[in-house]
């Protein structure tokens, strides 16, 4: 399953790469985050409840802002509600800088 949102210029893709792992690519900004959130709720809902690890690999994210970080926080909340463990890999430098300045770096489960 692949989730694609936004115009060609701001397309965001979430593609499964392994069991419970997803590759995220594109632009995560105020413009794209709401539609990515809506699509990802459906995607996360298709995973079985409880006990499953979820990993989002953000290596393919080309640009992000604070809305991208907010999206990660929402994914964390949703995973916790579904009793799943979530981790993030390869956070873009912009997102890591925003998380650090916001004091959120320590709560992000990164590998």
Predicted regions and their residues:
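STAS-typified acidic loop motif
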Residues: 4-41
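Amphipathic alpha-helical interaction surfaces in cytosolic regulatory modules
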Residues: 27-107
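Short acidic-hydrophobic, aromatic-tinged amphipathic segments that line or gate anion-handling sites
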Residues: 109-111
């Amino acid at each position: 399953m692949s989730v694609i949102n936004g115009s060609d210029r701001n397309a965001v893709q979430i593609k499964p790469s392994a069991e419970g792992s997803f590759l995220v690519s594109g632009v995560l900004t105020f413009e794209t985050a709401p539609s990515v959130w809506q699509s990802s709720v459906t995607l996360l809902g298709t995973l079985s409840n409880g006990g499953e690890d979820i990993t989002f690999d953000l290596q393919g994210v080309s640009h992000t802002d604070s809305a991208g970080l907010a999206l990660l926080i929402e994914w964390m909340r949703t995973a916790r509600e579904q009793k799943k463990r979530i981790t993030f890999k390869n956070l873009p430098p912009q997102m890591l800088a925003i998380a650090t300045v916001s004091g959120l770096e320590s709560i992000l489960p990164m590998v």
